[in-house]
């Protein structure tokens, strides 16, 4: 089966968040199943600079943007073994340093950039005489593609659309509707119209042959008014075409047995290295040495409301006053940064805030902490809790989205639990869950057994398993396209 993955991100060359990692993990896993996989991404300026040997495949392919035309070039690059990637290049739209924005904020023409990217896919496939069996489009940046295919483009190809986060709707101002190249039927409420705007995400949801989101629980949550971002009615309408598939983990990157970023490797057969990692982390972060005999929580996150940062700010005083240490690595909204700095000043040696995106430090926190906090308001899939399980670092998570599918509370799943969960989105509920984890930590034998269960449970979160589920969806999409 020929599969074309279309994405705005692909690790390691164009990464802003989990989307890039997901595409880099899924592509080789599908290849291993026997699929002929290609990945198309925009030719961002900084990516082209990092890939000077990118092979020119075709150039000056005309892409209609309504009242005017633009051109696209196609270049081939291999960012990682088993990943055949193609960059859609246009200097005026993508020749910049940044995926969605730069230091001054998001690019104001992002909707135009990704309309062009989406419309270039059928044009470039036609120019290169390439006919995939399936296009796998991802999030609002590629949501126009299923609508174009429904209108008649690429009639021999099926479309599968992946919702990584329903909260990002990809608005197009009505005055730019001509760029889309769609008839008025597609611009109606039954199509991509959304409260006076046009939504590229809604276009993908409305017109793809099959839909996927990134966890079973999230697939149900987005059918509710609370978490459907105004699209819950459409999600319920298309529920029979929707599947929830957990993302996998790249165990070549995230493994305590081989991790080059941590001071001492370890495994379930020999856990001595985890204690050494904890001591090294406490020393590096300037934490109280007495915390070697107390639970230390870590958190690796972006500082946005989705991630439950207000719960952390509200609960940290109680957590550290109960004898725990807390290390938080992340960057984002300035209001959260100020509050976290204030807490670090109030609890020196007990609470450490590191304002940065620092992947090597993220690995060291994952290995050195006793538990990992994920108190998200919502979490479509989540990866850090899966990393934590792999490292024997017990997750304390709010039971939402992918967190509910991967973290099993030791009380609710007697004998099979791998962490601690809570339901209410409040500092008190988070603090109570942390208190339960802290009390369990004091029973060293029970904590050791829990770590072993956690590490064993991580083994199912593979891209190979996810790829098999995607392949099944592709087969169903191809059958649906032929009807």
From Swiss-Prot:
Q: Does the keyword Ribonucleoprotein apply?
A: no
Any one GO biological process: glycogen biosynthetic process
Pathway connected to this protein: Glycan biosynthesis; glycogen biosynthesis
Which keywords does the record carry?
A: Glycogen biosynthesis, Glycosyltransferase, Transferase
What EC designation does it have? 2.4.1.21
The record's section on InterPro entries has: Glyco_trans_1, GS/SS, Starch_synth_cat_dom
* Entry GO MF terms: alpha-1,4-glucan glucosyltransferase (ADP-glucose donor) activity; alpha-1,4-glucan glucosyltransferase (UDP-glucose donor) activity
The reaction(s) catalysed by this protein are: [(1->4)-alpha-D-glucosyl](n) + ADP-alpha-D-glucose = [(1->4)-alpha-D-glucosyl](n+1) + ADP + H(+)
Can you tell me which residues bind ADP-alpha-D-glucose? 15
Q: What class of enzyme is it?
A: transferase
Q: Which NCBIfam families match?
A: glgA (TIGR02095), PRK00654.1-2 (NF001899)
Q: Which family does it belong to?
A: Belongs to the glycosyltransferase 1 family. Bacterial/plant glycogen synthase subfamily.
PANTHER family, per the entry = ALPHA AMYLASE DOMAIN-CONTAINING PROTEIN, GRANULE-BOUND STARCH SYNTHASE 1, CHLOROPLASTIC/AMYLOPLASTIC
Query: HAMAP family recorded for this chain?
Result: Glycogen_synth (MF_00484)
Protein purpose: Synthesizes alpha-1,4-glucan chains using ADP-glucose.
List the protein's name. Answer: Glycogen synthase
Q: Which organism is it from?
A: Desulfatibacillum aliphaticivorans
Organismal lineage: Bacteria, Pseudomonadati, Thermodesulfobacteriota, Desulfobacteria, Desulfobacterales
């Amino acid at each position: 089966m020929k599969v074309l993955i279309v994405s705005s991100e692909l690790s390691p060359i164009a990464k802003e968040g989990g989307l890039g990692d997901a595409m880099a993990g899924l592509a080789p896993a599908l290849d291993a199943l026997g699929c002929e996989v290609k990945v198309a991404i925009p030719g961002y300026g900084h990516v082209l600079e990092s890939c000077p040997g990118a092979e020119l495949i075709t150039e000056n392919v005309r892409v209609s943007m309504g009242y005017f035309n633009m051109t696209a070039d196609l270049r081939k690059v291999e960012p990682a073994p088993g990943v055949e990637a193609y960059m859609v290049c246009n200097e005026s739209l993508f020749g910049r340093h940044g995926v969605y924005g730069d230091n001054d904020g998001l690019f104001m023409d992002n909707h135009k950039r990704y309309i062009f990217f989406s419309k270039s896919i059928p044009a470039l496939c036609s120019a290169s005489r390439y006919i995939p069996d399936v296009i796998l489009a991802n999030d609002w940046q590629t949501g126009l593609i299923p609508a174009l295919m429904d209108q008649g483009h690429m009639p021999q190809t099926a479309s599968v659309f992946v919702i990584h986060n329903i909260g990002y709707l990809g608005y197009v101002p009505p005055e730019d509707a001509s760029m889309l190249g769609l008839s008025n039927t597609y611009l109606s409420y039954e199509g991509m119209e959304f409260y006076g705007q046009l939504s590229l995400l809604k276009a993908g949801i409305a017109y793809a042959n099959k839909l996927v989101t990134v966890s079973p629980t999230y697939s149900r949550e987005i059918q509710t008014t609370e978490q459907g971002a105004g699209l819950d009615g459409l999600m319920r309408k298309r529920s029979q075409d929707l599947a929830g598939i957990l993302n996998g983990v790249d165990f070549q990157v995230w493994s305590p047995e081989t991790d080059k970023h941590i001071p001492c490797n370890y495994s379930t057969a020999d856990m001595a290295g985890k204690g050494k990692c904890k001591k090294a982390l406490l020393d590096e972060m300037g934490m109280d040495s007495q915390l070697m005999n107390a639970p230390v929580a870590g958190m690796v996150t972006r500082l946005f409301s989705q991630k439950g940062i207000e719960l952390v700010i509200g609960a940290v005083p109680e957590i550290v006053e109960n004898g725990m240490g807390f290390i938080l690595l992340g960057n984002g909204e300035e209001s959260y940064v100020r509050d976290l700095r204030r807490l670090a000043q109030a609890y020196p040696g007990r609470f450490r805030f590191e304002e940065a995106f620092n992947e090597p430090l993220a690995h060291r926190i994952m290995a050195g902490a006793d538990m990992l906090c994920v108190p998200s308001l919502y979490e479509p899939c989540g990866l850090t809790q899966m990393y934590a399980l792999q490292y024997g670092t017990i997750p304390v998570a709010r039971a939402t989205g992918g967190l509910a599918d991967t973290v099993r509370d030791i009380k609710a799943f007697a004998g099979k639990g791998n962490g601690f969960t809570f339901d209410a989105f409040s500092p008190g509920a988070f603090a109570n869950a942390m208190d339960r984890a802290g009390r369990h930590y004091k029973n060293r034998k029970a904590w050791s057994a829990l770590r072993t269960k956690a590490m064993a449970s991580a083994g199912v979160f593979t891209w190979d398993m996810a790829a098999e589920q995607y392949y099944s969806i592709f087969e169903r999409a191809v059958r649906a396209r032929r009807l």
